[in-house]
Amino acid sequence: MDFNSRRITSIIENALLEDRATSDATSYACIDPNQRASATILAKQDCILAGIGCIARILDVYAALDGAVTSHYEVTSHPEIFDGVRLHKGQSVAVIRHNARVLLSCERVILNFLQRMSGIATLTRKFVDAVSGTKARILDTRKTAPGLRVIDKYAVRCGGGQNHRLDLSDGVLIKNNHIALAGGIVPALERAVRNRRGSQPIEVEVRTLQELDEALAYGAEAILLDNMSPEDVRRAVERCTPLERRVPLECSGGIRLENVRAYADTGVDFISVGLLTHSPQAADMSMRVSPA
């Protein structure tokens, strides 16, 4: 990921502004303005790392916001430390040498990014490992934190998952409310084929095997099996197997670590998991600061 991109820079800037990082009353009152310090970021649990590139970018954006602070700093980490690597409890993520006030003012923002992203990556890796040996691929959803979607979805990739739609413009996914308003699966598909932009893929959500048959009869390009049991997903896979045209099947709804293997064993192509980004547990990390 390009942490210097305008989109990521905007996210980081908003986080620093939200925390009033350049107006840190405590650090201003307690710390000499010229003091240098060294900060070590530590993993306090085993986890999958995501977001190490945000450290330097946060310091750069802080300097731009503050205006009076020099941006001179040094961020070092072991060559084997990179996004997607498994960290062990007590392992050093990075060491930062910088102005002491800046380190303290940016501490929470740096940790917020690293902990959330690494938490998502860690949970994603658990799901990926759980379906290992099957054809199923783990997908994310649009159930992300407001304003942080590009960050959340990058973290999913760090954990070994794949991204579904980035936003509403990224392909056609006909869901139950579209079907209800269009008057049924077939009318919804007919309108989608007629009105889609270019060659955008069209996926349709079905909740029963009867709806699956309707979608297949019309020639749906991809099908989302919503809130079906593993048994019904297996039946859906069996119905699609003899078809001359391969129709990718995705299942979603109520997918947890406890049952994801049962879904993967059905032969389904994709399993989308909202849990990855709407309810991740932040990875436990800390920053220890000492005089340089």
Model regions and ranges:
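Short secondary-structure boundary segments
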Residues: 227, 253, 275
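Short, charged, intrinsically disordered terminal tails
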Residues: 275-292
